[in-house]
Amino acid sequence: MTTRQSSFNYEEILSCGRGELFGPGNAQLPLPPMLMVHRITDISETGGAFDKGYIRAEYDVRPDDWYFPCHFAGNPIMPGCLGLDGMWQLTGFFLGWLGEPGRGMALSTGEVKFKGMVRPDTKLLEYGIDFKRVMRGRLVLGTADGYLKADGEVIYQASDLRVGLSKDKAA
């Protein structure tokens, strides 16, 4: 059995954004400023809430992050969709880490709950993604539940995050 790397630093995550980590044409994270992950602290193909694998990651919030001045002037808040996108980014990363071929795309999610906000004084975001299943066919499909913590408090939850990997290039 091959032992896979179980954590990734920022430089390794950037290499995924450049298409180097999993090879050309395979799962790729966005590059800054759209990259919503700074570290993957733990990743496993077993365990998690459904015993089908999990990923844990972190993002360091800075008061000068690009979205604060424009969302909203006088009341800076990170857009909730960026936290949700971070969950999709990690779901796709997991599929690439498993060695599955193809380019990633967010497909859907079930219920999303926003219970708090990310403000400039927030220090650390922590992601938790727990896999329910990975289906392998013409399209590789990962389904997971996820959460986002801000300074230790769960503020976002999403069920049935779905990301697919396709060998077709984006149009």
Swiss-Prot record:
Its main location: cytoplasm. It catalyses: a (3R)-hydroxyacyl-[ACP] = a (2E)-enoyl-[ACP] + H2O; (3R)-hydroxydecanoyl-[ACP] = (2E)-decenoyl-[ACP] + H2O; (2E)-decenoyl-[ACP] = (3Z)-decenoyl-[ACP]. GO terms for cellular component: cytoplasm. GO terms for biological process: unsaturated fatty acid biosynthetic process. Its EC number is 4.2.1.59, 5.3.3.14. The active site is at H71. It is found in: Cytoplasm. Necessary for the introduction of cis unsaturation into fatty acids. Catalyzes the dehydration of (3R)-3-hydroxydecanoyl-ACP to E-(2)-decenoyl-ACP and then its isomerization to Z-(3)-decenoyl-ACP. Can catalyze the dehydratase reaction for beta-hydroxyacyl-ACPs with saturated chain lengths up to 16:0, being most active on intermediate chain length. Homodimer. This is 3-hydroxydecanoyl-[acyl-carrier-protein] dehydratase. It comes from Rhizobium rhizogenes (strain K84 / ATCC BAA-868). The lineage of its organism: Bacteria, Pseudomonadati, Pseudomonadota, Alphaproteobacteria, Hyphomicrobiales. The gene is fabA.
